[in-house]
From Swiss-Prot:
Binds 1 zinc ion per subunit. The modification Phosphoserine is found at S210, S224. One of its GO terms (cellular component) is mitochondrial membrane. Disulfide bonds: none annotated. Expressed in lens. Its main location: mitochondrion. It catalyses: xylitol + NAD(+) = D-xylulose + NADH + H(+); keto-D-fructose + NADH + H(+) = D-sorbitol + NAD(+); L-iditol + NAD(+) = keto-L-sorbose + NADH + H(+). This is Sorbitol dehydrogenase. Substrate binds at Y50, E155, R298, Y299. GO terms for biological process: flagellated sperm motility; sorbitol catabolic process. It comes from Bos taurus (Bovine). Belongs to the zinc-containing alcohol dehydrogenase family. Its EC number is 1.1.1.-, 1.1.1.14, 1.1.1.9. SUPFAM superfamilies: GroES-like, NAD(P)-binding Rossmann-fold domains.
Length: 356
């Protein structure tokens, strides 16, 4: 009697509010791909947004799509042209893989390629499933002292690393991080690891600010009904001078305004959080003080640095994980994330290994 084929249980969004656990066929890797047995996948705000609204901006769910892009797993099969990986390797997955070598790839900014494959961004499937295939060049071996969960958290950490690179964070900088959600916290971690001397984190939530303090914020500032200018003054008071760098992770108009007012003349503000399409900001104030305003879109060339940070214990992402669920309870996990009950909710995809 033949052994039963393993199931490929997958979490699939069909449209706004329609989330299902379904069995998909186990994919066959192409020549430059690897088949992975998934282990840990974090829930991102974008996953919840696609479930709730069926779209993010111009990216619309038009057909069933597997969610998940913060992920790690184990190689179980390699394509014919893959040489750097073999079955048994533990890997972290970079979800954005170029489909072609276009002008952006040639200059190393493949995250800007309009044709890039990106997990769980329509129409591309993600990896919240038992088995998943991916471009082998965007799967990175994990050192023995880096856990699967840490490997999955390289994705959000990469957002923080890319933001800090775009902002030019360097030794001795004073940094303002607006927002103490997962992206604000990884930006804090990245800034400290890259040499920031002092970091202040702002948020509305006392509990989130408490977590920011736990993971390394030098100062925290709870926002209530202050004006942007008043917030900027408080930030300056905490740091002793204006921060050279502001990392704006909320996308909220008043927070962006406060960030511009707070940033030191000649400094840089990076926009990580995305809010309304049109936003009113004190542009003349920024221009006359030469405050550079830069956009941040995902990341590029960050996985090797992130792995080194984790392996050397320069950053500790473990406190970010507050809840864990097996894949079979993914719907409950998403409800937990939607209600804001957890900071980072992790789904364990391997029924035989639920360890971090």
């Amino acid at each position: 009697m033949a052994a039963a084929k393993p199931e490929n249980l997958s979490l699939v969004v069909h449209g706004p509010g329609d989330l299902r656990l379904e069995n998909y066929p186990i994919p066959e890797p192409g020549p430059n791909e690897v088949l992975l047995k998934m282990h840990s996948v974090g829930i991102c705000g974008s996953d919840v947004h696609y479930w709730q609204h069926g779209r993010i901006g111009d990216f619309v769910v038009k057909k069933p799509m597997v969610l998940g892009h913060e992920a790690s797993g184990t190689v179980v099969k390699v394509g014919s042209l893959v040489r750097h990986l073999q079955p048994g390797d533990r890997v972290a997955i970079e979800p954005g893989a170029p489909r072609e070598t276009d002008e952006f790839c040639k200059i190393g900014r493949y995250n800007l390629s309009p044709t890039i494959f990106f997990c769980a961004t329509p129409p591309d499937d993600g990896n919240l499933c038992r088995f998943y295939k991916h471009n082998a060049n965007f799967c990175y071996k994990l050192p023995d002292n880096v856990t699967f969960e840490e490997g999955a958290l390289i994705e959000p950490l990469s957002v923080g690393i890319h933001a800090c690179r775009r902002a030019g964070v360097t030794l001795g900088n004073k940094v303002l991080v607006c927002g103490a959600g997962p992206i604000g916290l990884v930006s804090l971690l990245a800034a400290k690891a890259m040499g920031a001397a002092q970091v202040v984190v702002t948020d509305l939530s006392a509990s989130r600010l408490s977590k920011a303090k736990e993971v390394g914020a030098d100062f925290i500032l709870q926002i209530s009904n202050e004006s942007p200018q008043e917030i900027a003054k408080k930030v300056e008071g905490l740091l002793g001078s204006k921060p050279e760098v502001t990392i704006e992770c909320t996308g909220v108009e008043t927070s962006i305004q406060a960030g511009i007012y707070a940033t030191h003349s000649g400094g840089t503000l990076v926009l990580v959080g995305l809010g309304s399409e049109m936003t009113s900001v004190p542009l003349v104030h920024a221009a006359t003080r030469e405050v550079d305003i830069k956009g941040v879109f995902r990341y590029c060339n960050t996985w090797p640095m992130a792995i080194s940070m984790l392996a050397s214990k320069s950053v500790n992402v473990k406190p970010l994980v507050t809840h864990r669920f097996p894949l079979e309870k993914a719907l409950e996990a998403f409800e937990t994330s939607k209600k804001g009950l957890g900071l980072k909710v992790m789904i364990k995809c391997d029924p035989n290994d639920q360890n971090p």
